[in-house]
Amino acid sequence: ADGYDSDCRYFRWRAEADYHGKTDEVNSILLERWKSSPKNINFYPTGQTTEIQNPDAASVEALGEVTGMSAAERGSSGALLALKITYEKGSALVRTEYNIRKVLGACAGNLVCADGTEQTDVTMLPSAFFAITKQEDGGMVLYGGGYGHGLGMSQNAFFVMAKAGMNY
């Protein structure tokens, strides 16, 4: 697809992500983000509908290893609004694009941009606007577009349009 920002490196991107062996890193990010925004990170032990109150490293560690991740909710634009993380003994629900981008960024090994460049130091996905394809080995391939929250008009497209003399 072509767009005003199709020449920008993050117009389309692809990331390989794998949560195997990254439970400690994922938990650390979740607890850090919980401190900033507790209503957007919820931990649930298996069989419980009530979340863990005031989670700490020990209570989250008791959930065991991460065994899966999946889209839990998408907005009308297709951007991911909630991510479900499945543990051996429970689950976590992660809300807001920033939190989702941080968690999956920790699991991403690399990011290939639209211009073919590869970014290997990924700590956060460029956008919450992506599709998830699960691999047989348990990993995931994330196909995304844009840079930022993934909602509304692309900042890069706006810049290109303004440079071309367009206005509203």
Show where each model-derived region lies.
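Conserved, single-site charged/polar hotspot
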Residues: A1-Y168
